[in-house]
């Protein structure tokens, strides 16, 4: 209790009844300031803040063709997190493994910073998961783990965010801005964005 996740649990309690869980947003309509979810339900708003990957929308209505094509050029990496129930004898919290012979590239040793934890977690790029000889006890594939920087990404995002913000749709955070932010930075950005759009 009172760990990092406690912040999000308390925030969720404050906005209970105003959040819909368990469904994907599949369409963003810039013309009518609304979203459509996978279950077919629409939600409208005066202002929309999007924090999901732009290229995860099945369709963005009202976006010019050149920006549609640009969004398709945004790149990301996918990471599998795999649990191993053994104990690693190390004082490290993270180990980085730059070894092409191993499928994983990073190990998270939770028991060194989270009391009562057992085992450790392997992080593996999606393209290397097949290198494991056996099935994992538990694993999770995060399709959108990290946004990747490409030569044209800054220009794409500048044009995209300028266009959508003129229509009261704001990209925020790691995926809304397609930038590798950690959550503490995003909380600060969210507070600043809320102050800005509340005074528009």
Model regions and ranges:
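Conserved beta-strand segments of alpha/beta enzyme cores
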Residues: 18-20, 135-136, 168
């Amino acid at each position: 209790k009172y760990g990092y996740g406690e912040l999000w649990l308390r925030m969720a309690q404050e906005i209970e009844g105003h959040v819909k869980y368990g469904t994907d947003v599949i369409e963003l309509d810039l013309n009518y300031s609304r979203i459509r979810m996978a279950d077919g339900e629409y939600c409208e708003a005066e202002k929309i803040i999007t924090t999901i990957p732009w290229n995860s929308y099945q369709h963005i209505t009202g976006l010019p063709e050149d920006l549609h094509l640009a969004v398709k050029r945004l790149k990301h990496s996918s990471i599998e997190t795999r649990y191993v129930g053994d104990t690693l004898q190390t004082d490290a919290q993270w180990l980085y493994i730059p070894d092409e012979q191993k499928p994983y590239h990073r190990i998270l040793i939770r028991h060194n910073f989270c009391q009562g934890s057992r085992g450790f977690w392997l992080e593996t790029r999606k393209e290397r998961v097949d290198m494991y000889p056996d099935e994992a006890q538990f694993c999770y594939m995060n399709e959108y783990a990290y946004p990747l920087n490409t030569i044209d990404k800054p220009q794409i995002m500048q044009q995209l965010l300028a266009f959508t913000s003129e229509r009261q749709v704001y990209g925020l955070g790691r995926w809304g801005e397609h930038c590798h932010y950690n959550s503490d930075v995003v909380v600060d950005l969210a507070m600043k964005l809320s102050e800005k759009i509340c005074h528009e």
